[in-house]
Curated annotation (Swiss-Prot):
Source organism per UniProt: Chlorobaculum parvum (strain DSM 263 / NCIMB 8327) (Chlorobium vibrioforme subsp. thiosulfatophilum)
InterPro entries (UniProt xref): AICAR_Tfase_dup_dom_sf, Cytidine_deaminase-like, MGS-like_dom, MGS-like_dom_sf, PurH-like
Domain comment in the entry: The IMP cyclohydrolase activity resides in the N-terminal region.
Pfam families: AICARFT_IMPCHas, MGS
Protein's pathway: Purine metabolism; IMP biosynthesis via de novo pathway; 5-formamido-1-(5-phospho-D-ribosyl)imidazole-4-carboxamide from 5-amino-1-(5-phospho-D-ribosyl)imidazole-4-carboxamide (10-formyl THF route): step 1/1; Purine metabolism; IMP biosynthesis via de novo pathway; IMP from 5-formamido-1-(5-phospho-D-ribosyl)imidazole-4-carboxamide: step 1/1
Catalytic activity: (6R)-10-formyltetrahydrofolate + 5-amino-1-(5-phospho-beta-D-ribosyl)imidazole-4-carboxamide = 5-formamido-1-(5-phospho-D-ribosyl)imidazole-4-carboxamide + (6S)-5,6,7,8-tetrahydrofolate; IMP + H2O = 5-formamido-1-(5-phospho-D-ribosyl)imidazole-4-carboxamide
Record key words, sorted: Hydrolase, Multifunctional enzyme, Purine biosynthesis, Transferase
Gene behind this protein: purH
Stated name of the protein: Bifunctional purine biosynthesis protein PurH
Domain MGS-like: 1-149
GO molecular function: IMP cyclohydrolase activity; phosphoribosylaminoimidazolecarboxamide formyltransferase activity
EC id: 2.1.2.3, 3.5.4.10
GO terms of biological process kind: 'de novo' IMP biosynthetic process
Cellular component GO terms, alphabetical: cytosol
Length: 523
């Protein structure tokens, strides 16, 4: 079957970007245009000859526009197989004329539910019924019908029509049809997630639909022999994308490992959004230094002093605009990526002198809600993001001694960081600065040893520090080792069958200890 010449088009769009120019071109090629509601008005106001869909159906739009395109003369005109004699006869007998092109985009359901004050009724009214039905009918009959859901495709269709005798190619029609089913799948996923949330359904659904759309290509993955890319993801809770949150201002393309480190660094710095100046230094997704101080430069100096070797080639995130004093301090070493919510005047000029350094602007906070997906050889693990954080008033003091105000501030600082470190985690903190980071060890005792060793390597005195453990101390030995190092207060989830032994050891060493009741394993 040859490519069918486009003679009749049905146009009904919520996003009217480019639609007037598109239809003006169609009309100039002799295409008959039918439309609905606001789209029809926009075309007629622009002087384009377009007729109401009611001309085809013989039926008015009713029920506040809920019913206008759900009609056999519409779907028969879309679904009829053009070279099928029975279909042709049925069309003649029922007064159905073929529709060759459909340009439809859907009611903005996702944008509607993203509004903070949206009502359930408003959300429901933004569920498109006729649009998806027309799109799916047209896409099914892609051998004969061209279907457009994206204004970016208008030019492609027009160019092909001009060079192909008023028709599009089969390849283009198939490509556009595939976009339809991707769109309607994502659309229905968003509606299903919203309905489930409105009904109070919690936990992962029995079936989940996730749309991935390539956003960035990458030279390779974690290692040069692995191919990779970054994909926008829509899991029904809205689309998550790098470009919506970040903007690379300088430097070569970001790698797979860079993306992991950016996620890790900004995940920690988000904990201190709105607080006093804070700096996070990350290497291989684990923090090697985190600190708060009255100035950003002082916070950076403190974070750097935790580990004076690891920051080379590392990733640094700031919770305040990067100022010149801090930029000069950072410029003393090579760092691979700097991430900030803004860069003060002159800072970019200074930092851009090192061409291998990437500078990244964080335009908005990271989304906290949603699901986390981890691929395994035997399936996809799905869990709710670990976004819950214990408040100071929720801490349970289990020792005879209460933590002082200063200890409590350090304990909360440590707990915000500990949950972002690979388990097993032991973290020493003093004066809102990491003093020793023990990460990713199979034994909690080994993590503690590493943390103490790292502190001693740079001459940081643990006397008067606090310690955080991402999971409970299974025995008193870990706590006793911390006490021996000079710790005065402890924060941990609790929950061990030997909690009493650990509490007794804390009391015996005059330690203040609080339980969070919330474990933060990170694998």
């Amino acid at each position: 079957m040859s490519d069918p010449v486009i003679k009749r088009a049905l146009v009904s769009v919520s996003d009217k970007t480019g639609i007037v120019d598109f239809c003006r071109e169609l009309a100039s090629m002799g295409v008959e245009i039918f439309s609905t509601g606001g789209t029809l008005k926009a075309l007629q106001d622009a002087g384009i000859a377009a007729e109401s869909i009611s001309t085809i159906t013989g039926f008015p739009e009713i029920m506040d526009g809920r019913v206008k395109t759900l009609h056999p003369k519409i779907h028969g005109g879309l679904l009829a197989v053009r070279d099928n004699a029975e279909h042709q006869q049925a069309a003649r007998e029922n007064g159905i004329e073929f529709i060759d092109l459909v340009a439809v985009n859907l009611y903005p359901f996702e944008a509607t539910i993203a509004k903070a004050d949206v009502s359930f009724e408003e959300a429901i009214e933004n569920i498109d019924i006729g649009g998806p039905s027309m799109l799916r009918s047209a896409a099914k009959n892609n051998e004969s019908v061209t279907v457009i859901t994206d204004a970016a495709d208008y030019a492609t269709v027009l160019d092909e029509m001009k060079s192909n005798g008023g028709a599009t190619t089969r390849t283009t029609r198939l490509t556009l049809a595939a976009k339809v089913y991707a769109l309607t799948s994502r659309y229905d996923t968003a509606i299903a997630a919203y309905m489930a949330k409105a009904a109070g359904v919690e936990g992962a659904n029995d079936t989940m639909t996730v749309k991935l759309e390539k956003e960035l290509g990458m030279r390779y993955g974690e290692n040069p022999h692995q191919s990779a890319g970054l994909y926008k993801m829509d899991d029904g809770n809205g689309t998550r994308s790098f470009g919506a949150i970040f903007e690379k201002l300088h430097g070569k393309e970001l790698s797979y490992n860079n993306m992991l480190d950016i996620a890790a660094a900004t995940g920690i710095i988000e904990e201190f959004r709105g607080e006093e100046p804070s700096v996070v230094i990350v290497k291989h997704t684990n923090p090697c230094g985190v600190a708060q101080a009255p100035t950003l430069c002082e916070a950076y100096r403190k974070a750097f002093s935790t580990d004076t070797q690891a920051p080379f080639g590392g990733i640094i995130a700031f919770n305040r605009p990067l100022d010149m004093e801090t930029a000069n301090a950072v410029n003393e070493i090579f760092t691979e990526i700097l991430i900030a919510p803004a860069f003060e005047e002159g800072v970019l000029d200074l930092l851009m002198k090192k061409k291998d350094r990437r500078l990244v602007l964080q335009k908005q906070p990271l989304p906290k809600a949603g699901w986390e997906f981890k691929s395994t050889p035997f399936g996809m693990l799905v869990q709710e993001r670990d976004s819950k954080m214990v408040a100071p008033e929720e801490l349970k003091v289990v020792t005879k001694r209460q933590p002082t105000e200063e200890e409590l501030a350090d304990l909360m600082f440590a707990w915000k960081i500990a949950r972002h470190i690979k388990s097993n985690t032991i973290l020493y903190v003093k004066n809102r600065q990491t003093f020793g980071v023990g990460a990713g060890q199979m034994s909690r005792v080994d993590s503690s040893k590493i943390a103490r060793w790292k502190a001693s390597e740079v001459g940081l005195d643990l006397k008067g520090s606090v310690v955080a453990s991402d999971a409970f101390f299974p025995f008193a030995d870990g706590l006793l080792a911390a006490a021996e190092a000079g710790v005065t207060a402890v924060i941990q989830p609790g929950g061990s069958i030997r909690d009493n032994e650990v509490i007794e050891a804390a009391d015996a060493n005059n330690l203040a200890m609080v339980f969070t009741g919330m474990r933060h394993f990170k694998h």
